[in-house]
Regions:
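Conserved alpha/beta enzyme-core scaffold
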Residues: 1-497
Length: 497
């Protein structure tokens, strides 16, 4: 039977999109990131730029993307504005050189911002799917993200049907687009595996310009084996959580976990799964990543809610080959639900995220090196940290051979402040900050988390700062960062083996 939607090439699809358009793309991490059309847009940008014609787009996604989108389009100088999150080296350089305007924002806010026009008109949506039906049901692939909202609010839609993605992924999907306030009812999610929606998103068929066929898997790199620092951080986190269970502050059946991405997060999850005293647990998180696959198959992870399956090829193959097992244990949701403050608070989620640096009072910088240069973005860390039952931040105490301390007197940029950060962990130890005033917090962080080579400096800073509820010396609070910029080391005379 003939499809009601025309088959078009990626190049044809790209030709429909004019300079200056606002284009939304599927993807939450590399999972379900649009693949063919972004590459064609990059090629079109190079061609037009070669003729002296302008071609730049405003790009909005659910989170970061794979290299086919942000990296490829940035190399082609095809992006003028970007939100809400990125992890592309080339795009990062363009943002930090003010070539690209970047809106770093909480991920659960994206759908509502689209609905109410905070970003202006959405001209196009390019969405990966396994199927679109004649009546406009769109079956998404390895992430849900903000795609359901993009489909509803874009003026025109292009669907990438990816034949490499399993049609059975729809069995994990639970899609609901919230109505606008003040007409929202309580969201009846009382367990990480509760389903309240449908396995498909919806689009007006009249908006669909065509289908681009692809056959390309997600490009998710595998994580490196955890190093000694990551393992020591993981040990401290596991020991703390077990002590909380013993003290009756975490129930014996445990609480749902949220974990950020990266090697430290993977090390923590692996350590939790391996420890015989940790009961089998659930997750309510943004991303389902590699470390969780074996934990689930071993019966250590009972169920997981996420916005995406951000899995390396080998782990994705394992999931798809065992869909009868995994389909009932993983729920994929839109990011306004996976990161919803009310659900996080109701379930009592334990949030575990990584920091670039933390100051002696527990303020966390997650995004900007020396307060100036963006790395990736705040992502969902703020939503989980502010609303979790326990908020934990992790980072190494030093890096670059000791030239950088990740515990500093004052963070030059703050994403998650002292009011939300309860636990701080480095390989040196764990600082429980609950119930402590600023002076006590500072003493504990320096004592438990700072590297020995920096402890004397931090203690001296604290003792010499003028008195106040929060002691700071505004003439010296960024001395370590200035030293780093001017001398390449926070303590230029420090020599570490």
């Amino acid at each position: 039977m003939k499809s009601r939607y025309p088959l078009i090439s990626a190049e044809e699809a790209a030709s429909f999109i004019p300079h200056g358009s606002t284009v939304t793309f599927s993807g939450f991490g590399a999972a379900a990131s649009a693949k063919a059309v972004p590459k064609a847009l990059a090629a079109r940008a190079r061609e037009l730029h070669g003729r002296g014609e302008p071609f730049k787009l405003r790009v909005l996604t659910g989170a970061s993307t794979d290299e086919n989108l942000d990296e490829e389009m940035a190399r082609a100088q095809a992006i003028s504005w970007r939100a809400p999150y990125q992890s592309s080296p080339t795009l990062r350089k363009q943002i930090n050189s003010q070539e690209v305007e970047y809106v770093d924002m909480h991920l659960s806010h994206v759908p509502q911002a689209v609905i109410f026009g905070f970003f202006g008109k959405i001209d196009f949506a390019v969405i990966e799917a396994t199927e679109i039906t004649p009546d406009g049901r769109v079956y998404l692939t390895t992430s849900i993200g903000a795609s359901p909202t993009f489909l509803q609010h874009a003026q025109k839609v292009i669907i990438e049907i990816n034949h490499s993605q399993s049609p059975r992924l729809r069995e994990m999907a639970d899609i609901l687009v919230l109505p606008p306030p003040p007409h929202r009812n309580p969201i009846p999610i009382h367990h990480p595996l509760t389903k309240i929606g449908w396995p498909y998103a919806v689009v007006d068929p009249l908006k669909v310009m065509g289908i681009v066929e692809t056959n390309e898997p997600d490009h998710v790199p595998g994580f490196s084996p955890p190093d000694e620092v990551s393992q020591r951080i993981a040990h401290h986190v596991v020991r703390f959580l077990l002590d909380e269970v013993s003290a009756g502050r975490i129930p014996k059946e445990f609480l749902p976990l949220q974990s950020g991405v990266g090697n430290v997060a993977n090390a923590v999850m692996a350590s939790l799964g391996e420890h015989p005293d940790v009961p089998p647990f659930q997750m309510y998180s943004e991303v389902y990543q590699d470390a969780l696959v074996d934990l689930m198959m071993d019966g250590r992870l009972l169920g997981a809610s996420a916005a995406s399956l951000n899995l390396s090829p080998s782990c994705m193959d394992k999931v798809i080959s065992n869909m009868d097992f995994f389909a009932s244990k993983i729920v994929l949701r839109p990011q306004e639900l996976s990161n919803h403050p009310g659900i996080i608070r109701r379930l009592g989620v334990i949030a575990m995220n990584t920091a670039l640096e933390a100051d002696i009072y527990g303020n966390v910088n997650s995004t900007h090196v020396c307060g100036q240069h963006i790395m990736n973005g705040v992502g969902g860390s703020g939503e989980f940290t502010r609303n979790s039952y326990l908020s934990i931040f992790m980072c190494p105490s030093i890096s670059k051979g000791g030239r950088i301390s990740h515990i500093v007197p004052m963070c030059p940029h703050v994403d998650n402040n002292e009011h939300s950060v309860q636990i701080l962990v480095t390989e040196q130890g764990l600082a429980d900050l609950r119930g402590l005033g600023p002076a006590q917090r500072a003493q504990r962080i320096i004592e438990r988390c700072a590297h020995p080579a920096y402890k004397d400096y931090l203690l001296r800073y604290l003792q010499e700062a003028p008195l106040g509820h929060i002691r700071h010396d505004l003439s010296r609070c960024f001395e370590l960062h200035r030293n780093l910029l001017e001398h390449g080391s926070m303590l230029p005379d420090l020599k570490l083996e």
